[in-house]
Amino acid sequence: MAKGFVRPAEPEDCSIIASNMRKEDVAEVWAASHHSPLDALTTGFVHSHPPMTIIKSPNIPVGMFGSIPMSFGQPTTAGIWMLGTDEIWDVRFQFLRESRHWLREVSEEYDLVYNVIDKRNELHIRWLRWLGFHLIREIPDFGPDKMPFIEFVRI
């Protein structure tokens, strides 16, 4: 199994991850916004404080995550996100062990972090629950395709 680590994201990570993005993440991004994988990653990279990249040895970006401030003047709320490639599976045990630490790192300055997730994405929903997120409501017609999404929050 490959060794992994997390580092601050670099602009070129967006195109590398986008070209190999997991089909579940591609479907979720499309259903939510009709954005391409590259557009979604670039938006997250530009607006996150800070964006972080998950690396598989030797130096292969396999995921990116961050939190985007949602409040003006008083940054107490953030949208949290993560997108990845199938290669994240190669560092899955380390990823799971370190997930809670990195969640604290990217959300420590906020009172509340939240987002929505495609209801079809059962694996990610289980992971969010394991991280301590609460699923607060189903949105039956979210995004341009009016797909069912679930809003989640961590306070």
Residue ranges and their predicted role:
Residues 41-54, 63, 111:
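A short helix-loop-beta-strand connector motif used in the catalytic cores of GNAT acetyltransferases and
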